[in-house]
């Protein structure tokens, strides 16, 4: 895969080069569209094999809303990390969420289509608009603020 512009796509192996998340917390399976400095469209295939369905909820499995938000944040992080030249020395954190709305449940068998647009980027902060769709229907939406920090500084801050 790979490429440039709006047609840029990434498979799971390429995604893992950018995101530090791994199973069971990597919530993006592929990128189907990416326009540098602007937007990304990513896919999460939701299956009954996801560990969270064991307890959320027995007999009526529903993807937890916080994990839908996490998939949005991961897609946003993937887009932002494309633009950082020294990304191996940086970490992205989710700093805040605003206007979060859940519109419909996401269940096993659904394909979550996550669309993220960069609204503003100033210094180490970036504001993004994220939406998640299932079969063309809005499932969730949020405004997210991401914060970029030096990896070494973040690793030393807990001492």
Placement of each model-derived feature along the sequence:
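Hydrophobic beta-strand-centered segment that forms part of the acyl-chain substrate-binding groove
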Residues: 2-9, 76-113, 139, 146-147
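HotDog/MaoC-like acyl-thioester-processing domains
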Residues: 7, 20, 36-37, 107-110, ...
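Hydrophobic core residues within well-ordered beta-strands of beta-rich domains
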Residues: 25-27, 112, 126
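Helix-adjacent hinge/juxtasegments
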Residues: 56-87
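A structural signal for short, well-ordered beta-strand segments
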Residues: 31, 42-44, 97-98, 102, ...
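N-terminal leader/capping segments at the start of a protein or of a new domain
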Residues: 1-33, 159
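Beta-strand-rich interaction surfaces with strong enrichment in secreted/lumenal proteins
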Residues: 16, 59, 102-104
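Catalytic strand-loop segment that frames the active site of acyl-thioester-processing enzymes
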Residues: 23-63, 68
